[in-house]
Every structure is written in C-alpha cells, then in structure tokens.
C-alpha cells in the first residue's frame, strides 16, 4: 500500500515516515510540504493513502489539496492530521471527502492504527 505525506514540518514528516514505513505492506512513496507540488505528485502517482497536514508551507492548506485531488481521484483515501483539530475543521474535512481527521497532539498513534488496518485490508483485497 503506497502512502503520500503532505506535511510542512520536517521532524513530523520524518516521524510519520519512520512510523508508517515500519508497518508491513505500507510504503511511504513521496512527500510534499506545499499544496501545489502535493497536488501534482498525488495526481501523477495515485497513492492508496494520503496523509494531509492542515497548515502547509506558503500559506496553503491540506484543504486545498483535498479540494483539488479528491474529485479527480476518489479512490484515494485521505486522512487529515493537524494541531488544529476543532470541530469545524473536522467537519469540513469530512465534507470534502477525508476519511478521518487526527489531532497531532492527542491522536498521533491512532494514525498508525488506522494505517495498519488499511494495509491489512489492502493486502487481503483481490488484485
């Protein structure tokens, strides 16, 4: 299962990549810290899962990525990950098609749990 990370903090991105890369069947295939290159790379590579930070470099957001990519690639599972986890952000993410929204400060390990489940389902799916 291929995962693309959209995260502007290098330490967080590295932590996510290490955590997710240790999951059997999961491979982090790319990353971006800004919406524009993220959109371009996601549409070019069609990963199975995209983890999106809300606030990105250059004043862009994960919502920009979700709005641009989701209609063109509805098969990709998007999950938001942010320190800004208030209900309005969670609700907007859901309306835009994100499958989940995680608070970085309290739900970081939950990301791993969800990806483990997703990788197991992906491995069991017929080709």
Where are these regions (language model features)?
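Two-component/phosphorelay signaling modules centered on CheY-like receiver
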Residues: 10-30
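Acidic, metal-coordinating helix/loop segments flanking the phosphotransfer/catalytic sites
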Residues: 31-49
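Conserved acidic carboxylate
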Residues: 7
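C-terminal output helix
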Residues: 88, 106-119
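Short amphipathic alpha-helix used as the core "switch/output" element in two-component signaling
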Residues: 63-75
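Conserved phosphotransfer microenvironments
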Residues: 53-66
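Alpha4 helix (beta4-alpha4-beta5 surface) of REC/receiver domains from two-component response regulators
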Residues: 85-102, 106
């Amino acid at each position: 299962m291929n995962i693309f990370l959209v995260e502007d903090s290098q330490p967080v991105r590295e932590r996510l990549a290490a955590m997710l890369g240790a999951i059997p069947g999961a491979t982090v295939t790319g990353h971006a810290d800004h919406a524009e290159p993220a959109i371009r790379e996601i549409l070019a590579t069609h990963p199975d899962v995209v983890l999106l930070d809300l606030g990105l470099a250059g004043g862009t957001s994960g919502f920009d990525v979700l709005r641009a990519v989701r209609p063109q690639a509805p098969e990709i599972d998007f999950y938001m990950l942010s320190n800004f986890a208030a209900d309005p952000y969670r609700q907007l993410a859901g309306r835009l098609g994100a499958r989940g929204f995680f608070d970085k400060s309290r739900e970081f390990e939950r990301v791993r749990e969800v990806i483990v489940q997703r990788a197991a389902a992906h491995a069991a799916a017929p080709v």
